[in-house]
């Protein structure tokens, strides 16, 4: 199985390095309110559960980090992050298909 948390974490580190800002602690409230990277409520509900929970934190960090990037790099990082989040949500949905959430 692909380690989405690792992929997302590496992407975040690369983006942070690029804009030279440091990682900060983020609360789950901030995650739920600020995660503009995630495109839909259903994706949020999938990612909010299980092993992919950390991806929401990464999404919010990415959202903050990319505000400091030039527009062409912002698009690149947001698209890459969105791809990872969608794959993780799909994997989580498959895993939980027979469970009541």
Range-by-range predicted roles:
Residues 50-64:
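Short, basic-rich loop-to-helix N-cap that marks the start of a DNA-contacting helix
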Residues 18-22, 50, 68, 72, ...:
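Surface-exposed polar/charged interaction patches
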Residues 1-25:
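A short, Lys/Arg-rich alpha-helix, primarily the initiator
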Residues 42-45, 59, 65-69:
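Acidic, low-complexity, intrinsically disordered interaction modules
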Residues 2, 73-101:
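Short, charged recognition helix plus adjacent turn
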Residues 26-35:
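Short alpha-helical "recognition helix" segments of helix-turn-helix
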Residues 36-54:
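Recognition helix of helix-turn-helix/homeodomain-like DNA-binding domains
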Residues 10, 14, 42, 46, ...:
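DNA-binding alpha-helical recognition surfaces that contact promoter or target DNA
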């Amino acid at each position: 199985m692909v380690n989405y948390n690792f992929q997302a974490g590496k992407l975040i580190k690369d983006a942070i390095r690029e804009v030279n800002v440091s990682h900060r602690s983020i609360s789950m409230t901030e995650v739920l309110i600020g995660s503009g990277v995630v495109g839909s409520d259903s994706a949020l509900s999938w990612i909010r559960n299980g092993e992919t929970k950390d991806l929401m934190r990464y999404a919010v960090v990415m959202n903050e980090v990319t505000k400091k990037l030039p527009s062409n790099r912002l698009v690149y990082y947001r698209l890459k992050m969105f791809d990872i989040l969608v794959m993780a949500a799909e994997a989580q949905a498959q895993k939980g298909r027979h469970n009541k959430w």
